[in-house]
């Protein structure tokens, strides 16, 4: 199974952008969850506005789908400035970045998604821009080449990444604010689903919102995507109000169980239990057993399973926990 095809993939998919624009919170007061991040950013933004300064450069990291782009847009809205958006892989040449930087107005936000994928050449351009609001440009080639400095307006760089550890130390150290986004609680996701349903003019019971939330793997992007699919199901079934029963039927049709697992999650956990006696099993063996790339297991499947206590990552390999056996209705093997 390809990760991009999974309904519960936390990566962005076609069709997500339209609904995101309709339901994305614009201000911190609309932002549900991440209470510590919300409180801290409120203080930092208010302080910057009182001083009439640009906000410090901000690094946002965490698993996909938790709202890094949303938070970047909220920061720009709260500061009352424009936001220019790009991503690490798109910035191939120093000139690409220079063009964006020189078009910024004072205090504007430059948002770079997947900032861990910037090339070393682009990072070298960023260092003086972030630190001194200056841009070093080479004019000419060979012995006649010379460097000139351009002054930039004070701006805020917001970088987003799922792999903070992949950032180079010089780049990471230049961010004055670092925020980690955590998986959301079922309660917060229930509020997010209810809010999204309201933005889409859907009538939905509290039970339906909760049912979608608890199968969303702690991820708002997945919750909103499941809401769209439940809406489709309700439309075809001529359900005026999306009830808890309608939500359960729709999610069962999508093969998403009560823990938010789909076929691929269950395949991985079943392989650990049935083929490797609960583990420990090495990553390469596990990847071969389920026919998936090791990166897919390590970056996509494991984080949520480990966070929820269904899988343990040890020096000897992956181990299924007691919770996994209970989920499948099995007795844990004992030696």
Curated annotation (Swiss-Prot):
Entry's SMART domains?
A: AAA
| Annotated spans, Small ATPAse domain (RuvB-S) | 185-255
EC code(s) of this entry: 3.6.4.-
Chain residues that bind DNA: 294, 313, 318
One Gene Ontology term, aspect cellular component: Holliday junction resolvase complex
What keywords were assigned to this record? ATP-binding, Cytoplasm, DNA damage, DNA recombination, DNA repair, DNA-binding, Hydrolase, Nucleotide-binding
- SUPFAM superfamilies in the cross-refs: P-loop containing nucleoside triphosphate hydrolases, Winged helix' DNA-binding domain
Large ATPase domain (RuvB-L) as annotated region, ranges:
4-184
How is the subunit organization of this protein annotated in UniProt?
Homohexamer. Forms an RuvA(8)-RuvB(12)-Holliday junction (HJ) complex. HJ DNA is sandwiched between 2 RuvA tetramers; dsDNA enters through RuvA and exits via RuvB. An RuvB hexamer assembles on each DNA strand where it exits the tetramer. Each RuvB hexamer is contacted by two RuvA subunits (via domain III) on 2 adjacent RuvB subunits; this complex drives branch migration. In the full resolvosome a probable DNA-RuvA(4)-RuvB(12)-RuvC(2) complex forms which resolves the HJ.
Function comment: The RuvA-RuvB-RuvC complex processes Holliday junction (HJ) DNA during genetic recombination and DNA repair, while the RuvA-RuvB complex plays an important role in the rescue of blocked DNA replication forks via replication fork reversal (RFR). RuvA specifically binds to HJ cruciform DNA, conferring on it an open structure. The RuvB hexamer acts as an ATP-dependent pump, pulling dsDNA into and through the RuvAB complex. RuvB forms 2 homohexamers on either side of HJ DNA bound by 1 or 2 RuvA tetramers; 4 subunits per hexamer contact DNA at a time.
Anything noted about its domains?
A: Has 3 domains, the large (RuvB-L) and small ATPase (RuvB-S) domains and the C-terminal head (RuvB-H) domain. The head domain binds DNA, while the ATPase domains jointly bind ATP, ADP or are empty depending on the state of the subunit in the translocation cycle. During a single DNA translocation step the structure of each domain remains the same, but their relative positions change.
The name this protein goes by in its record: Holliday junction branch migration complex subunit RuvB
Q: Which organism is it from?
A: Mannheimia succiniciproducens (strain KCTC 0769BP / MBEL55E)
This protein's gene is called ruvB
């Amino acid at each position: 199974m390809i990760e991009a095809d999974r309904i519960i993939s936390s990566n962005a998919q076609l069709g997500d952008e339209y609904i995101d624009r309709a339901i994305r919170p614009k201000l911190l007061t609309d932002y549900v969850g991440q209470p510590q991040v919300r409180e801290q950013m409120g203080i930092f933004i208010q302080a910057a506005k009182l001083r009439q300064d640009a906000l410090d450069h901000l690094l946002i990291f965490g698993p996909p789908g938790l709202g890094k782009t949303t938070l970047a847009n909220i920061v720009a809205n709260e500061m009352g400035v424009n936001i220019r958006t790009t991503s690490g892989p798109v910035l191939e040449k120093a000139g690409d970045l220079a063009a964006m930087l020189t078009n910024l107005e004072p205090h504007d936000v430059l948002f770079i998604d997947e900032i861990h994928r910037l090339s070393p050449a682009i990072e070298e351009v960023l260092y003086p821009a972030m630190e001194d609001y200056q841009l070093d440009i080479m004019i000419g080639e060979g012995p006649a080449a010379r460097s000139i400095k351009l002054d930039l307006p004070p701006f805020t760089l917001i970088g987003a990444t799922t792999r903070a550890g992949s950032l180079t130390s010089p780049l990471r150290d230049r961010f004055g604010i670092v925020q980690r986004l955590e998986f959301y609680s079922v309660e917060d996701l229930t509020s997010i689903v209810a809010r999204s349903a309201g933005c889409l003019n859907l009538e939905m019971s509290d039970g339906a919102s909760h049912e979608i939330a608890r199968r969303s793997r702690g991820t708002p992007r997945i919750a909103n995507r499941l809401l769209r699919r439940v809406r489709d199901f309700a439309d075809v079934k001529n359900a005026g109000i999306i009830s808890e029963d309608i939500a359960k039927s729709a999610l069962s049709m999508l093969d998403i169980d009560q823990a938010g697992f789909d076929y691929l999650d269950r395949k991985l956990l079943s392989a650990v239990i049935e083929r490797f006696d609960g583990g420990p099993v090495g990553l390469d063996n596990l990847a071969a057993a389920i026919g998936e790339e090791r990166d897919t297991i390590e970056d996509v499947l494991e984080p949520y399973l480990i966070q929820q206590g269904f899988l343990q990552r040890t020096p000897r390999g992956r181990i299924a926990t007691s919770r996994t056996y209970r989920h499948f209705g099995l007795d844990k093997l004992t030696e």
